[in-house]
Amino acid sequence: QAHFADTWNAWSMAERKVITIVALSQINGMIDVRKFNMQKLVENVTDYSAELRSLKEAGTILKIGDNAWKLTQEAFLWWWADKVRAITRESADFEQWLCAQEIDGLFTKEERKEMSDLAQNVRAILGKGAVTLIEGFAKGIAAGALKAIGM
């Protein structure tokens, strides 16, 4: 792993972008539940022709089609995927994370905020006509949940 980290740190930002585009295309743009906009990334890979050539000459990547490339080392691909997981995972500090886990009624504060954000998005999309419907639905769910727990 130290070898991969040293190699990664030696690359320029442009080379890291190329490696990321190649690696993501190799795993269909998904790492666990994270999904990336592959169409845009693959379209932009030709902007990095010098880096593609350099990485190909170094034996790091291999051309497998017109705009298709792959990493030559499978172990590096999985090291890279672990790095991306760490980078893209929630970056809240410990205190923020812990507070978000606190139960506030039936839900954690984080879940309550997510539901509130979702409701606001739905309301904005559907307009005022649907607000009454959504509020009635939400009140019905809340009443049913309270009844189910004996309140």
Label every PLM stretch briefly.
Residues 112-151:
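Membrane-inserting effector segments that mediate pore formation, membrane fusion
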Residues 53, 57, 81:
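Residue-level detection of the helix-turn-helix DNA-binding "recognition helix"
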Residues 1-49, 54, 94-97:
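Winged-helix-like regulatory helical subdomains adjacent to P-loop NTPase cores
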Residues 56-66:
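A short, conserved structural fragment
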Residues 67-73:
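Minor-groove-contacting beta-hairpin "wing" of winged helix-turn-helix DNA-binding domains
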Residues 75-106:
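Short, amphipathic alpha-helical interaction segments positioned at domain boundaries
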Residues 101-102, 106-117:
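Intrinsic, short, N-terminal disordered tails of RNA polymerase sigma-factor systems
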